[in-house]
């Protein structure tokens, strides 16, 4: 490729609405341009990197035995109504009607469509296992698209769907996809972690997310530095921080705490550690034609409620936070002074594992400006229902028993799910098993955010000059910067020969023949992030030398002109092989 025949749309300044590094650099490097909120044009530089990501994904999916197909972006409402997600999905699902008033959606995902394919095409256990995948444009009507390609409304995704005869076979399909994802992200050159995760709205029983580690990540990841354990904070098990409950050492007493509605303020006033206070959270579950059930959840004062874990407890599916009016009706006081002792109406108490092992703790007195100290289970309160209802914190013991947890930020770029029979049952996707009986197909689904990978890679790989691409997904591997290409025959001939030699060696090379000043050329290619640069000048050629500099190198080095192409080609191959 020659730069004079390519489009280079670099900018000196980032748009005012760009908040994070990847968004700023993708715009400045001429990779993307905004069309509407969360919708982008991918310019030639950006598209080249997208195609390289897609190529790696295709190679590894094919290697894992998946079969590529292509499903429509537009899907009929009937399929979503069959699965039940027409009502469940919410406003993120972009719905519209055609001229005949038929309802459709622009697909954010394709479980319904692929299940429709399977129920019509797969009849026997002999046709399974099978795994279909596609690389397709998706649309989710995000309420607040931001961060460029990180949280866009339109995006490119690889989604795959496996169909198996039973759950044991699904585990094998799942493992193949898990391993394929590890290979994909390793080949791309990302620092990543697979983490145990919650299935969310997709459904099913088991899942892992793949996170690129970056300070700008939206997700909190709990991991153990001394083991392989990693999980999304929303899914990580929080072990009790006390091995057993100590015997009571204090008498229960009511304490005046004027104006102290927060655990931190109460602890400071009483001169006790925050860890001895209890945070009370009131939830409600509605009962048709009757009063709601009111729940009091008890957490240590320095801990936070995990709503995902809470929703999985018996009776708490579909819970909501109680209104202030309900709180006053059941407890006789507004939030800030709530506790399990002396409620006006019966409430169901759930204590976090750590709280269940506490002694001599402090709770609200259900009276404004008062708390109760020296509270103990068994003596002052009946034994509670005990459950893991909190988020883990840095320093907590790792669930695998191999050290303490740390917390980092991650950008989710992939997710694998064991769906089970959720969609098969809802949509009647059955097959005939070995005994001649109809059984529901057992499904898995596996997604990778193709365009999001670009943003995540940049968040890990940049400096004050621009992007520093991992070799495998750089728009070009090598750039040739001739000094005076349009003025010097020697420079032009040397540059053209280098270009031909590198291209013949299979290197993705671009020759900057625009005739720009050296400073402009260097700034453009450092911003775009090409990993290797060769500078050809008359002075160097007289000495038989060409200047080489890697994008990550602090200084340039000189290479013999007659072997520069071979030397750089070897550097590229070595980088891709890592």
Swiss-Prot record:
Keywords: Aminoacyl-tRNA synthetase, ATP-binding, Cytoplasm, Ligase, Nucleotide-binding, Protein biosynthesis. The keyword Plastid does not apply. GO terms for molecular function: aminoacyl-tRNA deacylase activity; ATP binding; proline-tRNA ligase activity. GO terms for cellular component: cytosol. InterPro entries: aa-tRNA-synt_IIb (IPR002314), aa-tRNA-synth_II (IPR006195), aa-tRNA-synth_II/BPL/LPL (IPR045864), Anticodon-bd (IPR004154), Anticodon-bd_dom_sf (IPR036621), Pro-tRNA-ligase_IIa (IPR002316), Pro-tRNA-synth_IIa_bac-type (IPR004500), Pro-tRNA-Synthase_IIa_type1 (IPR023717). It is found in: Cytoplasm. Homodimer. NCBIfam families: PRK09194.1, proS_fam_II. This is Proline--tRNA ligase. The gene is proS.
């Amino acid at each position: 490729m020659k730069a004079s025949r390519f489009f280079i749309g670099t900018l000196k300044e980032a748009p005012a609405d760009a908040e994070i590094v990847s968004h700023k650099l993708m715009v400045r490097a001429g990779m993307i341009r905004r069309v509407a909120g969360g919708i982008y044009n991918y310019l030639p530089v950006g598209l080249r990197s997208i195609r390289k990501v897609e190529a790696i994904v295709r190679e590894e999916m094919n290697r894992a035995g998946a079969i590529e197909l292509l499903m429509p972006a537009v899907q009929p409402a009937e399929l979503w109504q069959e699965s039940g997600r027409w009502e469940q999905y919410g406003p993120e699902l972009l719905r519209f009607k055609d001229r005949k008033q038929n309802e459709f959606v622009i697909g954010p995902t394709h479980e319904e469509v692929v299940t429709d394919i399977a129920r019509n095409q797969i009849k026997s256990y002999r046709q399974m296992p099978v795994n279909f995948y596609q690389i397709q444009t998706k649309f989710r009507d995000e309420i607040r698209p931001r961060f460029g390609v990180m949280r866009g409304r339109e995006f490119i995704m690889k989604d795959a769907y496996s169909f198996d005869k039973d759950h044991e076979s699904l585990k094998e399909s799942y493992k193949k996809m898990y391993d394929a994802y590890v290979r994909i992200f390793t080949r791309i050159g990302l620092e990543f972690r697979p983490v145990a995760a919650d299935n969310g709205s997709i459904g099913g029983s088991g899942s892992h997310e793949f996170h690129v580690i970056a300070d700008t990540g939206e997700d909190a990841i709990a991991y153990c530095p001394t083991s392989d354990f990693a999980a999304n904070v929303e899914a990580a098990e929080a072990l009790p921080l006390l091995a057993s409950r100590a015997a009571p050492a204090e008498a229960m007493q009511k304490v005046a705490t004027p104006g102290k509605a927060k655990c931190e303020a109460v602890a400071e006033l009483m001169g006790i550690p925050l860890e001895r206070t209890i945070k009370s959270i009131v939830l409600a579950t509605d009962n048709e034609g009757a009063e709601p059930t009111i729940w009091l959840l008890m957490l240590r004062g320095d801990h936070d409620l995990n709503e995902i874990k809470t929703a999985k407890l018996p009776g708490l599916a579909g819970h909501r936070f109680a209104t202030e009016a309900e709180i006053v009706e059941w407890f006789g006081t507004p939030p800030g002074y709530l506790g399990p002792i002396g409620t006006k109406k019966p409430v169901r108490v759930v204590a976090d594992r750590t709280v269940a092992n506490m002694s001599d703790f402090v709770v609200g007195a259900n009276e404004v400006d008062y708390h109760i100290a020296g509270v103990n289970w068994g003596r002052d309160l009946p034994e509670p229902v005990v459950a893991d209802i909190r988020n883990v914190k840095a320093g907590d013991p790792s669930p695998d028993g191999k050290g303490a947890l740390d917390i980092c930020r991650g950008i989710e770029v992939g997710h694998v799910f064991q769906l089970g029979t959720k969609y098969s049952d809802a949509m009647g996707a059955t097959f005939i098993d070995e005994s001649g009986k109809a059984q529901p197909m057992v499904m898995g689904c596996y997604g990778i955010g193709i365009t999001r990978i670009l943003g995540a890679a940049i968040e890990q790989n940049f400096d004050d000059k621009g992007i520093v691409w991992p070799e495998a997904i750089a728009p070009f591997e090598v750039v040739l910067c001739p000094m005076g290409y349009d003025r010097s025959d020697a420079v032009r001939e040397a540059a053209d020969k280098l270009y031909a030699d590198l291209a013949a060696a299979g290197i993705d090379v671009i020759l900057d023949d625009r005739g720009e000043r050296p400073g402009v050329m260097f700034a453009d290619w450092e911003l775009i992030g090409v990993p290797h640069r060769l500078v050809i000048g008359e002075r160097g050629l007289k000495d038989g030398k060409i200047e080489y500099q890697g994008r990550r190198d602090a200084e340039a080095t000189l290479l013999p002109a007659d072997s520069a192409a071979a030397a750089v080609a070897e550097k590229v191959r070595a980088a891709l092989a890592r």
